[in-house]
Amino acid sequence: MKGKEYPFGYVEFLHSQQQNEYDNIEHDMFPIIDLYTDDDVTDIFINEYNNIWIVKDGKNIKVNNCFESESALSAWISLIAKTLKQPYMKTGDFKERDEIHPILDARFPNGSRIMATSPLITPKGTSVSLRKVPKKILTGDELIGFDYLTPEMMAYLQKAIRQKKNIVFVGNTGSGKTTLVRVMILFMDRGIRIITVEDTAELNVIDHFPLGIAFEAPVRKNVAADLATCITATKRAQPDCVVVGEIRTPTAMYAYYDVCTGGTVGNITTMHATSPKKAIIKMAIYLMKAGGFSFELAEQLIREEVDIIVQCRRDPEYGRRVSEITEVHDTELRSVFSFDKETQTFRDHR
């Protein structure tokens, strides 16, 4: 089977038309190809065709790159959607009763994520958020070297992993949650049966675990398998631990809670939250909605299953940091480590 290496990954072609489509994606990507191939650039944000930003070394930087026009950018996104078979706007077989999809959420062959919106919901024009897949998995020592956390914090988390604690990593977009989870997973015994579940595969660690399985639940036309369905399916695969890429819905939270109470230990998940306390509240609300519990009961159930919350933060002032590590107890949240923004130092509260 014929294949070709592109900047966005290697592709094996089923037919010549498929190669033409990928060739066109690469060709039309020319305005940002230098940004995409820069190993120091982690994210590319296209706010409008002529308003492009990147994240480099943890900092937001405006660049002079631009597409020729709004129509050129829009055509590139439509081509990506068609080639990757993702719903976006009106497809070729569109019927009047069909829904229009103004948001594209897709993954390049190498795992880079691309999210785009049409002018239907971003009136100034097509917007794009492109998160590049890292070329190498960072080590714990490298994260310490980047001042993302301290050796003491890393040792604490490593011990928690080996004690099979259930850990939730929370933070804003681009705060390093996935990177840190990847490091934590590689602290695990390579002989365990680990199952990862993600909307879009980003962890890419299963090759290190001979018994491991990776589930993915991307949006696909006529495919009835969302994140909650995949999480539930892990129970029948006899996992030793389950890692869920990100919980964003009540049904996914309920399915994850069900896994945690079913005898599987050392589980990990991530979600968006601005503090450990708000993470508990958010998880409780999700569980309340999906399970029909009162909020008080849902919060109690969450506290019983979550052992540690790791707060990650991306801040324009000081970049990426683990801003807090908190132990979850029945009646309190106990801060173990925190980052002092005023003094720019980490504190050990033990």
Where are these regions (language model features)?
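Conserved P-loop NTPase
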Residues: R303-R350
